[in-house]
C-alpha cells in the first residue's frame, strides 16, 4: 500500500463514523498536518473530491495522491486547486466530468449551492460543519449579524435555529 493510500485510508477510518449519510453528503476527509499531509486538504462533495494544495508539491506526488483517492473511493470526479500565497488560484480537473457551476450539496439536511470554479475553495468550509450546527442551536429566538460571509451558510443555520 502506498504511503498516500495509507494516510487517506487512516483519515477515512477516523471520520466515517461521524458522517450521517442520510443528512450530509459533504465532509473534510483529510485535514493537512492533522492527517500527515502538510498543507493539503481533501474535501468530499457527494461523489466528487476536491484536493487543495497550500504549498508547492511535485506533480508526481499530486498524481500519487489522486491515484490513492481513486483506488479507495472510485469517485466520479477529482478536482485540484493549488492555492499558493501571492499567486492566483490554479484549478485543474484531474479526471471525470466537469462539475456544473452551481452544484448542490447537503449538510445536516440543508442544501447549499457551491462552485468548484469560483474563488479559492467552494465557499462552504467543511471544517466548520459542527460550528454551523452549534450556531443553529444557539441562535434560536435571537438576531444574528453575519458580517463575514461568502455562502451565508452560518446565516442559513442561524435562520433555521
Question: Which residues does each predicted region cover?
Answer:
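Conserved SAM/SAH cofactor-binding pocket of Class I
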Residues: 137-161
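Short histidine-centered catalytic/ligand-binding loop motif
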Residues: 1, 50-59
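Conserved alpha-helix/loop element of class I SAM-dependent methyltransferases that forms part
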Residues: 126-142
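Non-catalytic substrate-recognition/targeting regions of SAM-dependent transferases
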Residues: 30-36, 41-43, 59-125, 133
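Solvent-exposed alpha-helices and their adjacent loops that cap or buttress functional pockets
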Residues: 21, 97, 136-138
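Non-catalytic accessory regions of SAM-dependent methyltransferases
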Residues: 1-46
Amino acid at each position: 500500500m502506498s504511503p498516500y493510500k495509507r494516510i487517506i485510508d487512516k483519515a477515512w477510518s477516523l471520520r466515517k463514523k461521524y458522517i450521517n449519510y442520510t443528512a450530509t453528503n459533504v465532509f473534510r476527509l483529510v485535514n493537512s498536518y492533522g492527517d500527515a499531509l502538510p498543507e493539503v486538504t481533501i474535501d468530499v462533495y457527494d461523489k466528487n473530491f476536491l484536493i487543495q494544495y497550500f504549498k508547492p508539491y511535485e506533480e508526481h506526488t499530486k498524481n500519487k495522491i489522486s491515484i490513492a483517492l481513486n483506488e479507495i473511493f472510485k469517485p466520479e470526479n477529482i478536482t485540484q486547486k493549488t492555492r499558493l500565497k501571492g499567486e492566483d488560484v490554479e484549478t485543474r480537473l484531474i479526471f471525470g466530468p466537469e462539475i456544473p457551476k452551481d452544484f448542490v450539496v447537503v449538510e445536516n439536511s440543508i442544501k447549499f449551492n457551491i462552485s468548484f470554479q469560483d474563488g479559492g475553495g467552494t465557499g462552504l468550509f467543511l471544517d466548520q460543519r459542527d460550528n454551523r450546527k452549534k450556531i443553529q442551536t444557539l441562535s434560536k429566538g435571537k438576531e444574528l449579524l453575519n458580517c463575514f460571509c461568502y455562502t451565508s451558510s452560518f446565516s442559513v443555520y442561524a435562520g433555521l435555529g
